[in-house]
């Protein structure tokens, strides 16, 4: 992915764009002001690479001294790879509990910020929305069928900047009393062009809130105006999840403009 990077305000750095104006006043202090604005690098989640499902599985066996219980496992998948803020991630999963303990399934949306400078890197993680399921008793199994995890007003993924990278993943896990939780990560992309977009696009302020955009070049008295800034990103209001059509509902031989083509494909 190339082009200009999306605006971003992070813990250890930012990608910020602004305009600065200065009024020259002879024999007096100049008047200055600055205004930040949001730049959004397009990530169209309607592209085929963002429509594929992400799937994985994990398993562990609990041990306590000489006693070994049966395995605990997770097999989970998302309905696609790309989403926009305001949409929901449809998570389908199978949880199997052959242990002697009651376990609780849950899923969370995570953001990872990676900052690069002078050959080193620093990583900061943030957890957002949480989805919790019903307890699974020993010897039982549970199934999630397109359980929805809402995406709040977060920044898009940033993959085209050499100093800041922003990634997202869905953590699907089992809380296991008296042991380390069993978890797995399903990487996703947060985009800027919604799924099946409807014009005009809508936007929302990021949930991280406003930041002060003053820096060492802005003196305390000469720079005037509102010097706070809140990034705004694409946000889908009133999103409704629509499950994909069943295989029996899809015509394997769609109508073509040339009937001979359809006939030959059935031979």
Stretch-by-stretch model annotation:
Residues 1-267:
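C-terminal beta-sandwich interaction modules and adjacent acidic
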């Amino acid at each position: 992915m190339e082009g200009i990077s999306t605006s971003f305000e992070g813990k250890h750095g930012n990608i910020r764009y602004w305009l600065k104006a200065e009024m020259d006043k002879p024999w007096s202090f100049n008047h200055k002001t600055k205004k930040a604005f949001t730049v959004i690098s397009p990530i169209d989640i309607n592209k085929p690479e963002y429509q594929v499902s992400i799937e994985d599985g994990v398993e562990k066996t609990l041990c306590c001294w000489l006693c070994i219980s049966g395995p605990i496992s997770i097999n989970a998948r998302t309905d696609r790879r790309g989403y926009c803020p305001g949409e929901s991630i449809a998570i389908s999963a199978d949880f199997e509990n052959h242990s002697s303990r009651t376990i609780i399934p849950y899923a969370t949306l995570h953001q990872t910020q990676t900052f690069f400078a002078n050959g080193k890197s620093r990583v900061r993680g943030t957890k957002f929305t949480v989805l919790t399921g019903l307890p699974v008793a020993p010897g039982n199994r549970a199934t999630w069928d397109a359980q929805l995890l809402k995406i709040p007003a977060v920044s898009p993924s940033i993959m085209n900047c050499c100093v800041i990278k922003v990634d997202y993943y869905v953590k699907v896990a089992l809380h296991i009393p008296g042991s380390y939780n069993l978890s797995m990560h399903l990487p996703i992309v947060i985009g800027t062009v919604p799924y099946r977009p409807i014009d005009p696009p809508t936007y929302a302020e990021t949930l991280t809130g406003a930041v002060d955009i003053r820096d060492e070049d802005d003196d305390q008295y000469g720079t005037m105006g509102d010097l706070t800034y809140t990034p705004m990103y694409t946000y889908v209001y009133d999103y409704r999840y629509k499950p994909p059509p069943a295989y029996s509902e899809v015509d394997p031989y769609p109508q073509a403009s040339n009937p001979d083509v359809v006939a030959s494909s059935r031979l």
